From Swiss-Prot:
Zn(2+) 1 binds at C4, H6, C96, C99. It catalyses: Thiol-dependent hydrolysis of ester, thioester, amide, peptide and isopeptide bonds formed by the C-terminal Gly of ubiquitin (a 76-residue protein attached to proteins as an intracellular targeting signal). Transmembrane segments: none annotated. The gene is UBP8. This is Ubiquitin carboxyl-terminal hydrolase 8. One of its GO terms (molecular function) is molecular adaptor activity. Histone deubiquitinating enzyme component of the transcription coactivator SAGA complex. SAGA acts as a general cofactor required for essentially all RNA polymerase II transcription. At the promoters, SAGA is required for transcription pre-initiation complex (PIC) recruitment. Zn(2+) 3 binds at C60, C63, H77, H83. It is an enzyme of class 3 (hydrolase). A zinc finger (UBP-type) spans 22-122.
Length: 471
């Protein structure tokens, strides 16, 4: 944070100074008193790419445009229009895009000075007292439901899903409109309970915490009706529930369509639901002749998460290297029509299309030949920022390359599900990163802040990464 000569130049004119300070104070008031829904959809959403970048979006001081930092959309706005001052939508600080630093001028960081420039109307206007919900609420364990609540926490703290739910895309088109009968309605109910606003009467009510669990109860009811194996007190797998929940979100979308009966799973390539537009990627499997390097067969298959072997591995990058490495197909009797030879072929997997949200499963549960199962407790080191450049197929690399150079493709860690215990007796806990970069631990109904250093020490089972930049 530094003293900005550009804002000092503006302050030389008393009228301009008054305007800047009043605008800054008004913006901070809006940021501090807006319900999360409004912040997500307005002040935290980039006006160019429409991505929600909590903590990395700036509101233009001169025209109100919101632009992100990650894709340089506010910088582009600044260069094109000449507006150089932006207010960070998360912390309310003013940033100068010419100085490339936050402004440390005392008039802009001293609340006492700013208060002098607040319009008199504020002292005469009554604003209803509201308790703002920020999503930081646990989910009560209703009998071995930790596998559900851990997945739900990672989902409802995903900015893409929050934007989708708060846009009311499903509720505006749902033909059922009942959270106890529609899975997506139940999810929307949970989001409303965790991010919506309470009035004074509701905030003081003793039933408030119970009311916040209504959506979760509805979701349990729907899930048990759809799949009875999810009911009861037996140990369940969080990864299987992740696959179940995204399938139900897709099915709800299909049912909302006017021609729902004509839509089938075969049409997923054209599906515009959040599952297939945000979470779906595709894998390219190639069979290559080791003699002449002829690529004789290539198949493209979709994926919603990647399962990685962790045995004898220490780092996530080692797991990805193993997933991507070339494999010799022994006893395959592969005949190459190009060089007219028969030999063992080479098979390799590469990512044909990367999703916006990349979900990775670390395969901790192993099925043994004697029919029993065991858990692999190996610690796998995983990064906060993951570079997926080396694991893409040639086509995906070419799509991002400039002048023949393949750029880094960076994903940011935003969620973790860890498993404590054994195969038969265990417990799931979620860790989620919210706006401002703060991590929180969700252990059923208990929520607590946790440092990033502690998060990176966890025995991860599922990792949720979101695309951040290609550079």
């Amino acid at each position: 944070m530094s003293i900005c000569p550009h804002i000092q130049q503006v302050f030389q004119n008393e009228k301009s100074k008054d305007g800047v300070l009043k605008t800054c104070n008004a913006a901070r008031y809006i940021l501090n008193h807006s319900v999360p829904k409004e912040k997500f959809l307005n002040t935290m959403k980039c006006g160019t790419c429409h991505e929600i970048n909590s903590g990395a979006t700036f509101m233009c001081l001169q025209c109100g445009f919101c632009g992100c930092w990650n894709h340089s959309h506010f910088l582009s706005h600044s260069k094109q229009i000449g507006h150089i001052f932006g207010i960070n939508s998360n912390n309310g600080l003013l940033f100068c895009f010419k100085c490339e630093d936050y402004i440390g001028n005392i008039d802009l960081i001293n609340d006492a000075i700013l208060a002098k420039y607040w319009d008199d109307v504020c002292t005469k206007t009554m604003v209803p007292s509201m308790e703002r919900r920020d999503g930081l609420s646990g989910l009560i364990n209703m009998g071995s439901t930790c596998f559900m609540s851990s997945i739900l926490q990672c989902l409802i703290h995903n900015p893409y899903f929050i934007r989708h739910s708060m846009s009311q895309i499903h509720s505006n088109n749902c033909k059922v409109r009942s959270p106890d009968k529609c899975f997506s309605c139940a999810l929307d109910k949970i989001v409303h309970e965790l991010y919506g606003a309470l009035n004074t009467k509701q905030a003081s009510s003793s039933s408030t915490s119970t009311n916040r669990q209504t959506g979760f109860i509805y979701l349990l009811t729907c899930a048990w009706k759809i799949n009875q194996n999810l009911a009861g007190y037996s140990q369940q797998d969080a990864h299987e529930f992740w696959q179940f929940i995204i399938n139900q979100i897709h099915q709800s979308y299909v049912l909302d369509l006017p021609n729902a009966k004509e839509v089938s799973r075969a049409n997923n390539k054209q599906c515009e639901c959040i599952v297939h537009t945000v979470f779906e990627g595709s894998l390219e499997s190639s069979i290559v002749c080791p003699g002449c390097q002829n690529n004789s067969k290539t198949t493209i298959d979709p994926f919603l998460d990647l399962s990685l072997d962790i045995k004898d591995k220490k780092k996530l990058y080692e797991c990805l290297d193993s997933f991507h490495k070339k494999e010799q197909l022994k006893d395959f009797n592969y005949h190459c029509g190009e060089c007219n030879s028969t030999q063992d072929a080479i098979k390799q997997l590469g990512i044909h299309k990367l999703p916006s949200v990349l979900v990775l499963q670390l395969k901790r549960f192993e099925h043994l030949l004697n029919g029993s199962n065991r858990k692999l407790d190996d610690f796998i080191e995983f990064p906060t920022y993951l570079n997926m450049k080396n694991y893409c197929s040639t086509k995906e690399k070419d799509k991002h390359s400039e002048n023949g150079k393949v750029p880094d493709i960076i994903y940011e860690l935003i969620g973790i599900v860890s498993h404590k215990g054994t195969v038969n007796e265990g417990h799931y806990i979620a860790f989620c990163k919210i706006s401002g970069g703060q991590w929180f631990k969700f252990n059923d109904s208990m929520v607590s802040s946790i440092s990033q250093e502690e998060v990176l020490k966890e025995q991860a089972y599922l990792l949720f990464y979101t695309i951040r930049q290609v550079n």
